[in-house]
Design a protein with these regions (language model features):
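Walker A/P-loop NTP-binding motif of AAA+ ATPase domains
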Residues: 1-172
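Conserved AAA+ ATPase small/helical "lid" subdomain
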Residues: 133, 157-202
């Protein structure tokens, strides 16, 4: 957030442009965007592919102008690679590149996609976005933390102790079985387990 301050401008630092997040569906890119907006104290402006495609080139220009006018904010461009996949793709790309290079508003763009190779290479060159991050599958410790967090919604034991209602051996079995699960899949796993237990009680 310090990079948006007048002090940063006085030091000659450029305004941050934004980041690209690459990862499989369900890896937590949307959650990351929400947390980033929260940390910056900026409202999140969700710009989906439907919004861009339905309005066309002229509406996209208007949208970027509104984003500038409503700054500070965090524009969130989901399924970013699909923005440039049709006959208007080159025009949209040119408009966005110009805006990124010339913008003077306190906006921080987060663009997400599943595969970086689907993105026009112009967008990953220096001076476009500040960073490209890969959001990978959660590791073993992270999987346990995610499961414990979601299980605690249904059973307070998971919030009150290190292992909740399970033994260490049971946790090890679950962690091994959930290798390459996304955060979304782990959340659904906790919900499915709770529903199964409730159906047995009923």
């Amino acid at each position: 957030k310090m990079d948006f301050t007048p002090a940063a401008r006085e030091c000659g630092l450029p305004l941050p442009r934004g980041w690209i997040l690459v990862g499989v569906p369900g890896a937590g890119k949307t959650y990351f965007a929400k947390i980033c907006a929260q940390k910056l104290g900026f409202p999140l402006v969700n710009i989906g592919i439907d919004v861009v495609k339905s309005g066309g080139v002229a509406k996209f220009k208007q949208l970027l102008s509104r984003i500038d006018a409503c700054a500070p904010n965090l524009p969130y461009l989901d399924e970013f690679d699909k923005f440039f996949a049709d006959e208007h793709g080159k025009e949209l790309l040119g408009i966005l590149l110009t805006w990124l290079n010339e913008k003077t508003s306190s906006t921080f763009v987060l663009a997400t996609l599943n595969r970086l190779e689907n993105l026009p290479p112009e967008l990953t060159r220096a001076g476009r976005f500040d960073r490209v991050f890969y959001v990978d599958f959660p590791g073993s410790d992270e999987r346990k933390q995610i499961l414990q967090l979601h299980c605690a919604r249904f059973d307070k034991r998971y919030a009150e102790s290190e292992h909740g209602a399970l033994s260490i051996e049971e946790w090890l079995t679950i962690i091994e079985a959930t290798n390459k699960y996304t955060g979304a899949e782990l959340a659904q796993m906790a919900i499915d387990q709770e529903q199964a237990e409730n159906s047995q009680i009923g």
